[in-house]
Structure formats: C-alpha cells, structure tokens
From Swiss-Prot:
This is D-galactonate dehydratase family member Dd703_0947. The record marks 327 as: Important for activity and substrate specificity. SUPFAM superfamilies: Enolase C-terminal domain-like, Enolase N-terminal domain-like. GO terms for biological process: amino acid catabolic process; carbohydrate catabolic process. Mg(2+) binds at residues 223, 249, 275. Its cofactor is Mg(2+). It comes from Musicola paradisiaca (strain Ech703) (Dickeya paradisiaca).
Length: 417
C-alpha cells in the first residue's frame, strides 16, 4: 500500500445564498478520500482563491495529510510575515480539510477526535432586527415560537438604516428613538450612513422596552460592532446593566483594546470580544486579565480548527467561554467546523447561527439540523458535510465589496463598518 499523500488542492467559489463563499478541497492518492474546509473571506474572495491556488497548493502537494499540526505550523510561517486575514483564511481551508480527512480515515466525526461529545445539542442564537422597538419585539416573538431561547437584538442594523438615503435614516431614527441625527446637507458622499450618538442613546430604550414586554425568561445579545468611541462603549455597557444581557459584543475596536480594562472596572455587563482578531495571541491578555467573558472568534480568520481548539482550551482554564462567529458569510463547511468545536468544548457558551436557504442545503449536503433553537451535526466520519460541485457552479461569485463595509457617519466621515 502506497503512503498517503496530498495530490491536489483546489478552491471552489460559490454563492448559493447570495454571499460569496470559498471552500477548499484537498484530495489524496487514496481513491475517494478528500477533505473540505472553509476559506471564506467574502470581502477579498478572489485574493483568497489566489493564495490557495498559487501558494498553498504547491506547498501541500506530496505531503502527508495526517500531519495536521506540522502542516499548520510550517504553512503559517512559509511566507515569513504571518497572520494576515487572506493567508489565514487560505490556511484555515486547508486545516479544516485535513481534519475532515483524518476523521474519515479514523471512521469518526471530527468532534470525537477533539475529545468527544460534551453535550447533546448546540444552543443557538439567531438575529432579530426592526425599524423600531415594537418591530424588534414582534420579530423576537416569532423566533421564540420557533424555540429560540437566545436572540441578538438590533434596531436599524448597527445604528443606521443600512442605506445611503440620509432622509430615510432620519425618518427611521426619529420614529424609533425620537432623535434627529446631525447630518451634512451638502455633498453627500456615497456610503452606508449611521449616527453613532443616536445609536448609543437608542439601545437602552430598546432593551427597556423588550424586558418590559418579554421579561427576563429569554437571553438577549447585542452587537456594538466597534462603531462607537471607547467612552461611549463604557457608558453603554453601564446603562445596559439593568437589562441583564447575555453579552455585549465587540464594544470597542481592536485598536482601542486597552479601554476594555476601564470598561470592565465600571460595568458588570458580560463582554464578548474578538470578531476582528486574526491571531489567537490577541485574546491572551484579555483572558489573562479577566477582561472578557466570551471569545468572539471567526475561526477561518485565525487559521482553522487547529488554533481554535487551542484557544478554546486556554479560555477554559481561565473561565472564559466560546462564542464562535457564525454569520451568513461563512460556508456551511465552516458552520460544521464551528459546531464540531462546540460539541467537544466543555466551556462552550453559545453559537451564532444564520439560517440556510434551500440552495445552500442542496449545494452542501449534510448541513446541521436545527430543532427548537438547537443544532445537531450528523455522526458521519469527518466534518459530515460534502459539496455538489456541479450545483455549486450554478451560483457564481461576483467578488464585489459588500456595501455595508462602506460605513460613514452623518457628516460624511468614513467609519468602521
């Protein structure tokens, strides 16, 4: 029997849900044995494909796919400079695919290789939004009827109307918050506008309404999306204390991370942090100094399952729980990777989940099953998910930059998305 080795690495781009996705397929010299991994960096999808096809593939071909740690370590430093989001996503796609292969070789789901089941199902949180407090409440009630016990509550997206129409923003903000945003009447620069001051004043009103109407029997999450100043984030966290959030997500930007210490000193609102981090070492001082309660981690952007499991274990030792990023711009393969980590991590906190349409489930057979706000992965060897490449070709990627990243404040200043 010939020694197992990698014979081909390719990138599959597809958008069956209307969002550009990148999936890596690592093939071996054993007939029918291959692995899949998520390398989705939607905002730079073609750059990731180039990184995989032109750099990762030549690096990997001929190597033993079972040497996951060695491949991860050597690939991570092969470009000398490291931990950029493009190469990390490329590395993630490969890393997940190697875990998929190893699970298939062992005849076990990946969660068994990571230590085995810690729970029967995976509690999920879903997203709710609305133009005003009543609309948000109605949408939460609909999710509660579906069985969800955790919901993320936003009003007008992240402090705006998700549009470049300033009049519409003013109308929605005035309707929802009785606040008139300060906006420039001239030379409107194209972009997605929001008002951070109006937003910060509206959020406590939203949660006051929701707790008055829905009580404390459901868990609420709110995402600041790093869109306010550090001082405003501290004020917001303090003001939200009476409403007992499950957590407040990304209250400050990575560039302002030192402010978390002051926030922690002044507020008991639980904090989740790290959606924009690209290196597991970025969480270390936050975990060591007890500045966060949840690791908010985009698994593909830090390099895949291998570093994510290490981060989860380090967090466990320090009383911090997991909250892997689960938006619509990760592939179902990435969703499964998150959930295998969830199943095997005793310090699991919560899993974000974005519903999948029929096209996604057809292109990716083996997607997790959702029942009453819980997710269940199958027990097939590996990650338990596949891809129909013929169907995937019917949903080409456009490679454009998503409009929501073009954020501006009412005076036209470019801002963090």
């Amino acid at each position: 029997m010939s020694k197992l080795k990698i014979t081909n690495v390719k990138t599959i781009l597809t958008a069956p849900g209307g969002i550009d996705l990148a999936v890596v397929k690592v093939e071996t010299n054993e007939p029918g044995l291959y692995g899949l991994g998520c390398a989705t960096f939607t905002q730079r999808i073609f750059a990731v494909k180039s990184a995989i096809d032109e750099y990762m593939a030549p690096f990997l071909i001929g190597k033993d796919p079972t040497r996951i740690e060695d491949i991860w370590q050597s690939a991570a430093v092969s470009g000398y400079w490291r931990n950029g989001p493009i190469m990390n996503n490329a590395l993630s796609g490969v890393d997940m695919a190697l875990w998929d292969i190893k699970g298939k070789l062992a005849g076990m789901p990946v969660y068994e290789l990571l230590g085995g089941k810690c729970r029967d199902g995976i509690p999920l949180y879903c997203h709710t939004d609305g133009g005003d407090e009543v609309e948000v409440e109605d949408n939460i009630r609909a999710r509660m009827e579906e069985g969800y016990q955790y919901v993320r509550c936003q009003m007008g997206m992240y402090g705006g109307a998700g549009t470049d129409d300033l009049k519409l923003i003013a109308t929605q903000l005035a309707r929802a918050k009785n606040i008139q945003p300060k906006r420039s009447p001239r030379s409107k620069t194209p972009g997605i506008y929001f008002d951070p001051e109006a937003y910060a004043k509206s959020v406590p009103r939203l949660f006051e309404h929701l707790r008055n109407k829905l009580g404390f029997g459901i868990e609420f999450i709110h995402d600041v999306h790093e869109r306010v100043t550090p001082v405003t984030a501290i004020q917001l966290a303090k003001t939200l204390e009476p409403y007992q959030l499950f957590y407040l997500e990304d209250p400050v930007a990575p560039e302002n991370i030192d402010w978390l210490r002051m926030l922690r000193q002044q507020s008991s609102t639980p904090i989740s942090m790290g959606e924009l981090f690209v290196n597991i070492n970025e969480w270390k001082p936050l975990i060591d100094n007890k500045l966060i309660d949840y690791i908010r981690c985009h698994v593909s952007t830090i390099g895949g399952i291998t570093p994510a499991k290490k981060l989860a274990v380090y967090s466990e030792l320090n009383g911090v729980r997991t909250a892997w990023h689960g938006p619509g711009d990760i592939s179902p393969v990435g969703v499964c990777a998150n959930m295998h980590l969830d199943m095997s991590s005793p310090n699991f906190g919560i899993q974000e989940y974005t519903p999948m349409n029929d096209a996604l489930r057809e292109v990716f057979p083996g997607c997790p099953e959702i029942d009453q706000g819980y997710a269940y992965v199958n027990d097939k060897p590996g990650l338990g998910i596949d891809i129909n490449e013929t169907l995937a070709e019917k949903y080409p990627c456009d490679g454009g930059i998503p409009s929501w990243t073009m954020a501006r404040t009412p005076d036209g200043t470019a801002s963090r998305p």
